[in-house]
Structure formats: structure tokens, C-alpha cells
Regions:
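A glycine-rich helix->loop->beta "capping" turn
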Residues: 13-16, 36-47, 55
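The beta1-alpha1 cofactor-binding region of Rossmann-like NAD(H)/NADP(H)-dependent oxidoreductases
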Residues: 21-32, 64
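Substrate-binding pocket helix/loop in short-chain dehydrogenase/reductase
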Residues: 58-59, 63-69
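Active-site loop immediately N-terminal to the catalytic Tyr-X3-Lys motif
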Residues: 60, 107-114
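Active-site helix of classical SDR
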Residues: 82, 118
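Residue(s) in the substrate-gating loop at a strand-loop-helix junction
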Residues: 102
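SDR active-site lid
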Residues: 135-183
Length: 183
């Protein structure tokens, strides 16, 4: 529903919008996507890599499968999306890639190691790609955004450890976990 709502909102800006629901960790599916978009719109000017999953567990509790699943979406999904679309974007006179990191790509808290590694990785990947595009004098501009808490369904579909049971809307509980700078 939120994907459809977002597409509807963007119609007010007179831009062509495609919405595609795919598993971003599926490299083959991601690399097939640019041609579908080009067939629909004729070209691609902007890619917004925005996928995430929540895992709430300690490093010791997490399994290889947890790491593969989490980083497959959080980090490799962004890498796949970027690599799939980049050759097409470089053909445009102006183009942009926007990758969603997180405030947790800037700081860390307990029981979120997989999420943090993924989001720190997105930040590093994006900064590196931005420098490479400048080095090439490419028309592609590259950005990462680092939002804080946003009311999405990410927590509803994540893997959680019940030991971290705080109300993220409660300023005192957040401050106790993150420290006084979180207020």
C-alpha cells in the first residue's frame, strides 16, 4: 500500500515513476529491472535504492543465515541496484543515485550489528561511488541519506530479540539507551 501511495504522491510532480516489487538480494532480478524501466519510460534519470530489514539480536546470537539475509538486503541490494542501473544513468545528461543509509550508519547501539554493518556499508559504498563519478567527470551525482526513525513497517517484518524492549517514541527510554545526545 505504501508503495502505491508514494507513486500517487509523485504524480503531482509531473515525473515518470515506476514501482517494482522485487527481492533486492536477488541479483538476477535486480539486473533485469533496468530494461523494464527503459521499456516503460525510454530512459532512467534517477535511482533511489531504499530497502531495509530489522534484526535485533546480539553478535553472539546472530547466525550466518541472519548475516547473509540481512546484508543481502541492506548492503548487497544497494550494490546490485547501483551496478544494474549505473551504465544507463551514465548515458544521461544529468542523473542521480540516492541510497538510503540510516542514522544507524553514523552511530551504533547494542543488538543491531547486522543493521549497522549494512547501513555503514551503504554509506561507505555511496561515498566511494560519489568520488569515482567525480573522478570520471560523470553526469551521475551520488548521495546517501541518513534518516532517523520513520514510521514504516520495517520493525513489523524484522527479526527481533525480546530483550531490547523499548518504546522508540519515549524520549527517556531512547536517551537511556543511546545517551543524552539522543534527545
Amino acid at each position: 500500500d505504501t508503495l502505491n501511495e508514494t507513486a500517487e504522491l509523485l504524480k503531482n510532480y509531473n515525473v515518470g515513476v515506476s514501482k517494482h516489487l522485487i527481492d533486492v538480494s536477488d541479483k538476477e532480478a535486480v539486473f533485469a529491472l533496468p530494461q523494464k524501466v527503459i521499456d516503460e519510460h525510454g530512459a532512467v534519470d534517477m535511482v533511489f535504492n531504499n530497502a531495509g530489514v530489522a534484526l535485533s539480536q546480539t553478535v553472539e546470537e546472530s547466525t550466518d543465515e541472519d548475516w547473509d539475509w540481512g546484508l543481502g538486503i541492506l548492503l548487497h541490494g544497494v550494490i546490485n541496484g547501483t551496478r544494474a542501473f549505473l551504465p544507463h544513468l551514465k548515458k544521461r545528461p544529468e542523473a542521480a543515485i540516492i541510497n538510503t543509509s540510516s542514522v544507524f550508519g553514523l552511530l551504533s547501539v547494542p543488538t543491531q550489528s547486522i543493521y549497522h554493518v549494512g547501513k555503514y556499508g551503504v554509506r561507505a559504498f555511496t561515498e566511494t561511488l560519489a568520488l569515482e563519478m567525480k573522478m570520471e567527470n560523470s553526469p551521475v551525482e551520488v548521495y546517501s541519506v541518513h534518516p532517523g526513525h520513520i514510521g514504516t513497517n520495517i520493525a513489523n517484518y524484522g527479526v527481533q530479540n525480546e530483550r531490547l524492549d523499548i518504546d522508540l517514541e519515549n524520549e527517556d527510554e531512547v536517551s537511556n539507551l543511546f545517551g543524552p545526545r539522543a534527545k
